[in-house]
């Protein structure tokens, strides 16, 4: 039993004993009255101490009435992240599609930057689902890895949002789809055009078109492959034919993504 509970029960028992002595001890005269009065004083003292403070096992005393301590958030990677799909979060311009300006306008709902308030969610991290240019609503089929989809806004708006988040102690994670690109990405488009231009039976040469090695092409159909329109070639596309898988074993592809990562991390 905690010290707080012991004090409450002690107070209840003392009050009960005092009431019994008062009811039964009327004939005992002044001594009984003095005893009861002394007991009542002790009860009041115990109740006052129990109401004002509580002492823990370390000997420190904390208020049970009001706690004015400010929330202390450790500076580590264990945070409360809010996964945010911009498309459906908040539309700031009335076009029916959520945007980065909408996220900026509703940032106080997520975290108002004041640890003493309790009207916000109090998150300290945002995981932004893909925000880069794409031909679909979900934006996982990227057409440009170093820009913002026009439906969502501009790089300037993103930078403004990033600054506002950092001012509130919010960290931002970008969902960067590196496993595949869009079939509309210039890399894939150039590789496709090159393959279409090859004479029948000719093998592709990466020195003529380096992007042909950015993806997995094959003359034979395999599971998870889609046919390249207008050719006898197939390409790996595990999700769907609009998202061709990238060849991450290719050093050139890895260097591309090192540069892309630096672009966003340097903002």
What are these regions (language model features)?
Residues 25-26, 62-258:
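Acidic/aromatic-lined carbohydrate-recognition and catalytic surfaces
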Residues 13-18:
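Hydrophobic helical h-region of N-terminal Sec-dependent signal peptides
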Residues 2-12:
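Bacterial N-terminal signal peptides that target proteins for export
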Residues 1-2, 26:
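Non-catalytic effector/regulatory segments
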Residues 25-54, 58:
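Short, low-complexity, disordered segments immediately C-terminal to signal peptides
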Residues 20-23:
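C-terminal motif of bacterial Sec signal peptides marking the signal peptidase cleavage site
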Residues 55-58, 252, 259-267:
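Short, intrinsically disordered, charge-balanced linker/junction segments flanking boundaries
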């Amino acid at each position: 039993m905690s010290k707080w509970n012991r004090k409450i029960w002690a107070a209840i028992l003392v009050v009960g004993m005092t009431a019994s002595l008062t009811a039964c001890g009327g004939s005992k005269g002044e001594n009984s009255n003095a005893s009861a009065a002394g007991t009542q004083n002790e009860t009041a003292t115990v109740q006052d101490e129990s109401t004002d403070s509580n002492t823990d096992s370390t000997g420190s005393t904390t208020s049970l009435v009001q706690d004015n301590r400010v929330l202390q958030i450790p500076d580590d990677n264990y945070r409360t992240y809010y996964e945010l799909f911009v498309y459906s979060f908040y539309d700031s311009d009335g076009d029916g599609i959520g945007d980065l300006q909408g996220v900026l306008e509703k940032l106080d709902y997520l975290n108002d930057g004041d640890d003493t308030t309790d009207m916000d969610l109090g998150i300290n991290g945002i995981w932004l689902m893909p925000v880069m240019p794409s031909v679909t609503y979900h934006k996982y089929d990227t057409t440009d890895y170093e820009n913002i989809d026009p439906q969502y806004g501009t790089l300037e708006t993103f930078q403004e949002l990033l600054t506002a988040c950092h001012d509130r102690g919010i960290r931002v994670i970008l969902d960067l789809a590196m496993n595949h690109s869009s079939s509309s990405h210039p890399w894939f488009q150039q590789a496709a055009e090159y393959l279409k231009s090859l004479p029948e039976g000719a093998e592709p040469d990466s020195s003529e078109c380096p992007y042909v090695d950015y993806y997995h092409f094959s003359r034979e159909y395999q599971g998870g492959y889609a046919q390249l329109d207008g050719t006898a070639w197939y390409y790996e596309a595990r999700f769907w034919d609009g998202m061709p898988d990238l060849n991450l074993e290719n050093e050139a592809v890895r260097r591309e993504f090192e540069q892309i990562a630096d672009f966003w991390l340097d903002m």
